[in-house]
Amino acid sequence: KKEPKRFYPNGSLAANVLGFVGLDGTGLAGIEQVYNEKITGEPGKVFIEKDSRGRAYESTEVAGRPGQTVVLTIDQSIQYQAETALTMAIEQSGAKAGTAIVLDPHTGEILALANAPTFDPNDVGAASPAARNNWALQNIYEPGSTFKVVAFSAAIEKGLAKPSDTIDCQMGSITVAKRVIHDHHPFGTLTIADALAKSSNVAAIKLGLRVGDPTMYEYITRFGFGSRTGVELPGETAGVIRPVSRWQPSSIGSVAIGQEVGVTPLQMAAAFGALANDGVRVAPHLIREIRSAGGGSSYRPNPEQRRVISKQTASALRGMLEGVTLNGTAKKAQLDGYTAAGKTGTAQKIDPKTRTYSKTKFVASFVGFAPVNDPAVVIIVVIDEPGGAYHGGDVAAPVFRQIAEQILPEMGVIPDTDFKNPELVARAVQTPAEISKMRDEEKRRDEDVREQESRDSTMPRVAARDNKGGEIVYAVATSNAILMPDLRGRSVRDVARACAQLGMQLEARGEGGRALGQTPGAGAELRQGEIIYVDFGKLN
């Protein structure tokens, strides 16, 4: 007897978002767990009446309720780029773990949510607990300097400072309630804008002192810190923000520079989304819609929108954060063809043995957006315990750049500065018609993806829509569970291994590199021993 079995055609892609199911098909993590009842539906039932001899004489059949299709905001290509860049950074730096999130600041849609290490939901048993952990929303960290935007925003919003004002950074040292705090460089007098660009602790603390404890706490919570974002995934933490009543006299000196607080990467991405979206924070979310078995939409999200700061203050912060990439600590986040703004963070971790800040373990981060005047995306990159270089500007900022330079042209975002790389020029000058044609070709390559579930299965798709309204399948159910995975972007070796595991024959075409196209398309049903045709070449 063949039993329905969950299969994930894209392997580990977006695994921490999708989650996985148990042997009985019940969702145990991720979207699978949260929407298990909607996805699974209800099986049909047959009631049989028998006589005293056990012979059936009447039966009543109750039809099953087909499951619904959950459509995600995740963009397959953007997710792939984020995972690739993050994994490369983790391997090169020897880091313990990391996360990268790509967010649309205007809609709150999460376009990519990547974690490293990760796992293949088709083989959950081989994954370590650390790989199954969704670091983007379950682990908290002290944000360090990325948190300084709260003090700067509050001071400007309250009229206590302007970007052009000057502030004495006291040659890199300030005392708060007998605690001495230093800058990484002995700065003298700087403008407020330059103080943020150079990430002066002294300036941030002075602005925090101007604002005061209660107002500082108010703006921390306005930006969404201390509360769950409400994203549709299990296990999200609210972070750690102590009420003002529990602050010490020296706490403002710590909080203003991102110490004594614990946040998640998703919270930080949403906070910068408010700066990118003219001061309005839109709650991040992963569900675009839920569709009934008949194809109609049964649910569309209405994310919370909340004004955090004025449009004028947000505009001022965007300009100041652009200075961070141009003249400050995030020069490695500068983009080819696009303006960028953001903030670096380098936070010391607490040593559990001494309960003091470690001198060898750090969390490096960068969160920013591009283009500056009309941001299309917010991207946050957080690297836990990198080896060697550990500053956010050296470790995380280059990952932001790699992701942004790949996805912005693909999204059709119009460049707002000069290009240096001719390959990026060619990609960015595509007309809307050319972009549409490219996506149509991608859609045709995937036309074999199953559009409806077989009647004997009550486990439908977890999917995402592309910009043309097409559907990318992330998880499917089938009576024999042999479906074609998406091989695009994989090496010859990985493709050969996948085909061997499926019991299929591989016919490779081209001269090495990465898989560019395949026949059959992702999600198509396969016959045992079927020939798989894969075209290889260099990725643009």
Region locations from a protein language model:
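C-terminal, active-site-flanking charged/polar segments
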Residues: 373, 378, 386-387, 393-417
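Ligand-recognition elements built from short beta-strands and adjacent flexible loops
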Residues: 337, 402-540
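Conserved, well-ordered alpha-helix/loop/beta-strand core segments that scaffold catalytic motifs
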Residues: 1, 55-98
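Acidic/histidine-enriched alpha-helical segments
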Residues: 5, 95-107, 168-171, 233-237, ...
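Small/polar-residue-rich segments within soluble enzyme cores
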Residues: 1-67, 381, 398
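Beta-lactam-recognizing serine transpeptidase/beta-lactamase-like catalytic domain environment
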Residues: 50-61, 74, 105-145, 150-383
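Solvent-exposed, polar/charged alpha-helical surfaces in well-ordered, non-transmembrane soluble domains
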Residues: 11, 15-19, 29, 33, ...
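Flexible, solvent-exposed loop/hinge segments and secondary-structure transition points
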Residues: 14, 25, 78, 85-107, ...
